[in-house]
Amino acid sequence: MNQALKELRDRGLMSQSFGNLEEVFSTPQTFYIGFDPTADSLGVHHLIGLIAAKILQTHGHRPIILVGGATCAIGDPSGKSEERKAISMETVFHNVEKVKEQIGKIVDFSSAAPNAAILVNNYDWYKDYKFLDFIRDVGKKITVNYLMAKENVRKRLEREGSGISFQEFSYGLLQGYVFVHLYNHYGCRVQIAGQDNLGNMVTGQDLLHKMQGADDVCGITWELATCADGRKFGKTEGNTVWLDKEKTTPYEFYQFWLNQSDEDSERFIKMFTLIPLEEIAKLVEEHKANPSARVLQKELAKYMTCMVHSEEEYNKAVEASNILFGKSTTEDLANIDEPTFLAVMKGVNKVEVPKDDIMNGINVIDMAVLHNKVTSKSDARKLIKGNGFSINKSKVVDDKMTVNSEMLIDGKYLLLQKGKKEYTLVVAK
């Protein structure tokens, strides 16, 4: 089997396909993968496609990264129970610029090699394609019955009280024609995409056959990632895990991968990383010999954080993890940036105190009872006497100590700790 295709299959990145893949991939090919820039960041679920593209690029094939500036404005009805809200072209252009930077961290645009990736925006040709010309050139090649039989359209029509606008109905035709354009202008013969995009891929294949007489094109899809327990992949506590660190901090990103189950980690480390499969097999053996060491989760979290962010951000995330779960120090707390600190504290009990009170000084006993697990002043004194109470990771040994503004982290926070793992965050307002 062709080595590029074998690696995709072995990593779980190939489910269904069409065309003669072995014959086509016997020589270097140009292939494309598309992203509709509906947000100003890609999510972790997009990484599957980028890794698949990187694998093919590593084997000598040229990726076209297609951003759907035009199709994004129309809206893909796949998996949607109602029509998506319209996105302005200004927002689309902004989103394109943002995701371009993220994609460039994984696929290689800068290489002088003939298979350096290129980025194409379908808005660049659709903006000048007149409606009457498109209907005449493309619309007459595909019947309404054909489009209505597509699963994404059919499900919307079958849903009671629902329907589909002509705008969304046209999405499959616009998306299918993308393949024709890339075939004509770049010699692109292969599309890769998630399984949910198979219908649009086949439309592109059919249009190529009818418009160009092309029978030498192929498509590859992968199953959408899901967690073993049935949870939707790519979300934590109901929120999307983004690649943009302003939307999901590197610490939260690191924790997302670190908290995967054993079963999911074994699958995901193949799907989302480029770690050689032989090395992964050894990691799996090591993990099974000592599951509590969480070897797979740690390696997965390290690789993903370094790839999407940087080694520096990975090291910061590890240090931040030690705040609540390890032996960090007051100095460690002071060195962590505020967004990371707040991400670590997301689930910690919080209490607000007037900043003026802290500026004037508060007795440590009065401060200690602000902790939700410290029941009284006498309880606070016992904790301090028994070395069981800390502020900012420093043990409190004097129950007459005064807490003042010099102790504030970033000029506004105090971390109160009872015992080893019970925390309250004081926020000076």
Each language-model region and where it sits:
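Conserved nucleotide- and phosphate/pyrophosphate-binding catalytic cores
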Residues: 208-429
